[in-house]
Amino acid sequence: MDTVDFGQVFAFTGVDIFTKEVSVKLYESLTSKDGLDFLAFSFNNRFNHVELLQTDGGPEFKAEFRSSVFKYADRFRVARPYKKNEQSFIESFNRSLRKECLGWSKYKQNDIPSLEKELSDYLMYYHNKRPHMSLNMMTPNQFKENLVSDI
């Protein structure tokens, strides 16, 4: 999990490094309470339970967030500072989010409703239409469907 700064709007992001599924939610602030809300949102709507959850060392992933991590993950890890390789999957997605959807603009809090619509459309595209080389040119949803049918 990570965050992307868009001025007065912050995108909390999460990626499953196996299926390439993502979760994104926009907030007006960058607090551990927001981090906790994003944790619950992501796991209740997308990820269910994982073996390992990794975040950067930001304050949004401390306090209330850390006290709830083990409801959703067996293990928790904080990436080492200045070691971007440890966050390469989420950093790659964050770059795609900027390049393909929200850009490099600085937004105001009152922009959130229109940004949420844009983000919702992008996530539908990302999960259902956008192929990934690491998934053998399948979308995340196609890959997940193939996984289930192979079991």
Region annotations inferred by a language model:
Residues 1-3, 17, 29, 57, ...:
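Residues immediately flanking
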Residues 4-6, 33, 58-60:
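Short beta->alpha connector loops
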Residues 24-48:
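Active-site beta-loop-alpha junctions of metal-dependent nucleic acid enzymes
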Residues 55-70, 78-100, 113-116, 143:
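RNase H-like two-metal-ion nuclease catalytic core shared by retroviral integrases
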